[in-house]
Amino acid sequence: MSLALNPVAFNLGPIQVKWYGILMATGVLVATLMAINEGKKRQIMPDDFIDFLLWAVPIGFIGARIYYVVFEWGYFSQHPDQIIAIWNGGIAIYGGLIAGLIVLLVFCHQRMLPPFLMLDIIAPGVMAAQVIARWGNFMNQEAHGAKTTLSFLESLHLPHFIIQQMYIDGSYYQPTYLYESALNLVGLILILSLRHRKHLFKRGEVFFSYVIWYAAVRFFVEGMRTDSLYIANTIRVSQALSLILFFGAIILWVYRRKVIKPKWYLAGSGLKYPYNRD
């Protein structure tokens, strides 16, 4: 296997630096730069995003690990020494997103920042980070789907290096990481191209759009994966949560449009953008 497909990018003495970590760090960096750039248009200082990042990243990782441990408690209850062994793998993005959301709400309260505005600013960057970080699963040959055939993968007109990386232990597998990354990229392009159109999105609705899109994508892709976390060995956790988020975001969107109409929320309020800070 070529170096480009080796999960280890390089070594620093005894420490292995893996592509997974590099791609995750790249995703965080891209998300931060996107938020800072958009924040300048909304009168949010760059320091606010940096300070938020310093709290959100470590707590997000802790949340991602706790989420995984909770739904794999049958194993970790017998191996408690492995609970903190995050270097062996085992984090769940939904856990990280939930933890990050909690941090954001607390942070906005302390800084007196409008939370839905911050969510609108940050959401596209989070989606971009997800697009990038999923390729870490590709490098690790994990988070894939069921067995498939070489002819099927070739019918997708995938680059040769992707097909070869999907050859694991003598069989080819569905590149579900690629499906999720590609679909999220489509969603990201749509959101970025539409979010500044006047009267299309009110405050909070860029965030709702992200939640609805990602929940739908994750529900679809999760049904193809072979490493899902389960509730009672029957219900896929991520699919159940995706349904809750999908319909929850739609309900909140409609509720805010129909019931809650503060000055900054109304179309034609004279603001440059419907979700500008005021």
Swiss-Prot record:
Pathway membership: Protein modification; lipoprotein biosynthesis (diacylglyceryl transfer)
Locations listed in the record: Cell membrane
Keywords linked to the UniProt accession: Cell membrane, Membrane, Transferase, Transmembrane, Transmembrane helix
Enzyme class: transferase
EC numbers: 2.5.1.145
Main location: membrane
Entry keyword Transmembrane: yes
GO molecular function, one term: phosphatidylglycerol-prolipoprotein diacylglyceryl transferase activity
One Pfam family named in its UniProt record: LGT
Membrane topology: Multi-pass membrane protein
GO BP annotations, alphabetical order: lipoprotein biosynthetic process
GO cellular component terms given for this protein: plasma membrane
Residues given in the record as a 1,2-diacyl-sn-glycero-3-phospho-(1'-sn-glycerol) binding sites: 134
Function comment: Catalyzes the transfer of the diacylglyceryl group from phosphatidylglycerol to the sulfhydryl group of the N-terminal cysteine of a prolipoprotein, the first step in the formation of mature lipoproteins.
Entries under PANTHER family matching the protein: PHOSPHATIDYLGLYCEROL--PROLIPOPROTEIN DIACYLGLYCERYL TRANSFERASE, PROLIPOPROTEIN DIACYLGLYCERYL TRANSFERASE
Family listed: Belongs to the Lgt family.
Name of this chain's protein: Phosphatidylglycerol--prolipoprotein diacylglyceryl transferase
Biological source species: Lactobacillus gasseri (strain ATCC 33323 / DSM 20243 / BCRC 14619 / CIP 102991 / JCM 1131 / KCTC 3163 / NCIMB 11718 / NCTC 13722 / AM63)
